[in-house]
């Protein structure tokens, strides 16, 4: 006979066995994760007990209601993952990394509660639609994470009740702000080679159905070692270097093909214009069909209490947009309806002059011409160009080596080769050196679908001067 998967022999007291099985299951919790498979936590291990208690707080459960990829679900049908699943994943990767690092640096084990709690809570301050509204409304989710950790919250009470490590909340805030010593502990959670990026590249790639973010996670983790003298983490060996190079190219591809996908840009711009209209109407004392106080204060840039901020999530924001479909203002009503029904704006890349750099004066002139022509066309369709036309720019570096002049220079990826050479990655790798020096800035025209057929004509018109100059040159040659 089997009870809970355990064979019971004749004569054994079943009641006692059932009690033992129950105690085992009560102590352990398993999260079935599509990326990391079984994430098992055990209450008998202090750091894992802390994690379990933090997961059960209302502040952390809120992350279930915030999309990891903002509005990317409009572009990729599977992009429905939450900040909750990502945060649990980051904690799990951090735990794996500690296991690897402690083989040569046993002292890191005493920091396990701090590292795991920091990894778990690093994103607890995200607002509705994650980074999308953060960029639109100019707030800092990391600052909100610190306020939630240090405020009058369930998270703070769990941290204060963890007697194995006093002042844990203050230590986590310092670690997230990169003010904690030793500094390499912060690098585990936030750096150019951190557990946050490892998880989101794997997870976002999986959820969007793309292969760009695949990386050799275990090989990278095995190659990482602590250099206590330099207070940093280094990647050791040729195999580790190769895996890190692949990781950086994967990050580049994820930004180019997923995060900055043209439909994602259009969806973000659409939401930005919708919220811009809301803010304009608020200034005009418009009487909305619906608007709760925390949302009004948030959109207006007013100071929020932690409780007010915690009431904001994707569900609440989407409910507002649903209600605004019934609003009396025709522009807000139209933008809200288009957003809900995925009749979103479109986007097209504005091509720079032949051989011209994005930042030169000629290209700026082209962008301005394209925007002005589009505004005139939109106006002819009876739409307000202020809310139906935009220029979006994208630019990023998959790896940013240390620059002394930078205000907040990111940590280098340091390689220790098999021959003992220690160097910054881009100095050792020509391919990464080229990646660092590349120009990845692009400009995109955002416009309503009604004028889709006219957009190419607008681009040709903007480049007409260049075309005429080329033809004139060719004529002289002939």
Report residues per predicted region:
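Elongated alpha-helical scaffolds
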Residues: 114, 119-120
